[in-house]
Curated annotation (Swiss-Prot):
UniProt family annotation: Belongs to the peroxisomal membrane protein PXMP2/4 family.
Cell location: Mitochondrion inner membrane
Transmembrane portions of the chain: 51-70, 98-118, 135-155
Major localisation: mitochondrion
Function as written in the Swiss-Prot or TrEMBL entry: May be involved in cellular response to stress. Required to maintain mitochondrial DNA (mtDNA) integrity and stability.
Keywords: Membrane, Mitochondrion, Mitochondrion inner membrane, Transmembrane, Transmembrane helix
Top-level taxon in the UniProt lineage: Eukaryota
PANTHER family tied to this protein: PEROXISOMAL MEMBRANE PROTEIN 2, PXMP2 MPV17, PROTEIN MPV17
Organism in which the protein naturally occurs: Eremothecium gossypii (strain ATCC 10895 / CBS 109.51 / FGSC 9923 / NRRL Y-1056)
GO cellular component: cytoplasm; mitochondrial inner membrane; mitochondrion
InterPro entries noted in UniProt: Mpv17_PMP22 (IPR007248)
Membrane topology: Multi-pass membrane protein
Protein name: Protein SYM1
Length: 182
């Protein structure tokens, strides 16, 4: 396992965007694989195109947005308090949960609906069905995790740390998306 982390760290230093894109895409896709195999729809078989959509979302969109977001959050600072001060960590978690989460949740459902060939009306329906319940679930899962992430993990590894928990979160998102009526 340590050789994997050495490889990952070297890749992150030499090709940060590519490494984040592939890692994030892989983990979003893995979440869908888990959702399809562990929570299958009755009578449905595994759909590789369904897995491709979250892979592309993670690799192309979320990896870029997430990396920039975590770099921005690392600069959030209250007055002259040290970066690691608990008040700054809480401010980062508050920004993450009150700014990014309400935008990130609909971004996912919008991207999935459009990649599935849905219309803007389909997007509207999916968001009206899923946005609030997913945001509430997000607020149950992520704040405590992000407190640890922002206080213990170096900024260049925060996206990977989030991506590890995201295997489970992405499984939930994929399952939730697959149960949308649109």
């Amino acid at each position: 396992m340590s050789s994997f982390f050495k490889f990952y760290k070297a890749s992150l230093q030499s090709h940060p965007k590519r490494t984040n894109a592939l890692t994030t895409g892989f983990l979003f896709g893995l979440g869908d694989i888990v959702a399809q195999t562990q929570f299958p729809e009755p009578g449905a078989s595994y759909d590789p195109m369904r897995t491709l959509r979250p892979f592309l979302y993670g690799a192309v969109l979320f990896s870029l947005v997430g990396d920039k977001w975590y770099r921005f959050l690392s600069t959030v600072r209250l007055g002259r308090l040290p970066q690691a001060h608990w008040a700054n960590v809480l401010a980062r978690v508050a920004c993450d949960q009150l700014i990014f989460a309400p935008i990130g949740v609909p971004l996912y459902y919008t991207a999935m609906a459009l990649m599935e060939g849905g219309s803007l009306e389909d997007v509207r329906i999916r968001l009206s069905e899923k946005w609030w319940s997913t945001l509430l679930a997000n607020w149950i899962v992520w704040p405590a995790f992000q407190l640890c992430n922002f206080s213990l993990v170096p900024v260049q590894h925060r996206l990977l740390t989030v991506n590890v928990l995201s295997i489970f979160w992405n499984t939930y998102l994929s399952y939730s998306n697959s149960t949308a009526s649109s």
